[in-house]
Amino acid sequence: VQSQWVSTCAGVFSKKVFTKFHFDNQFMKYSWNEYLDFSYSIFKEHQKSLFVTPQAKYIDVATSDGRIPLKELIYMSAVYDMYIFLNRFEMTYKNILIFIWSMFGRLIINIIKILIRYPKKIKLILDYLYAPIYVMLNFSKIKKGNLDFFNKTLL
């Protein structure tokens, strides 16, 4: 099945791909959509070159090692998603509306997840509500491709 992006946790790429395409060094510490950015950049230049197969099997060995606190992940997802959106997609009214709608949907889903999975961490809801504001306060930096304001908080 042809695809516009491939998850790199189970993706296979030819070695020569890495001579032309690279992971963006703005993404730090934890895996959050850098695979989307990497593989989508391949798709943009070589459409019909990415495939996924439903027959592929792999084992995801979950571990707590290297996981970041939920609060940090909330802000990371908001900042990195805006970065990808601004750098990979046309700024049409349709795309902007779809992006905003998807962020709103994710906000609702994540609030429900917190209420169900982490009822003792209900304060995380405030982080989910503030993360889009944080992104807008730093919008010009994100648009310029400078994520240092956020990445320095990860070290």
Language-model features: locations:
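Short acidic, glycine/proline-rich loop/turn micro-motifs
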Residues: D24, A62-R67
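Membrane-proximal basic amphipathic "stem/tether" segments
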Residues: L97-L155
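Alpha-helix N-cap/helix-start motif at coil-to-helix transitions, marked by capping-box chemistry
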Residues: S7, E72-M76, I98, S102
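Short glycine-enriched, charge-decorated loop/helix-capping segments at active-site entrances
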Residues: F27-K29, R67-L70
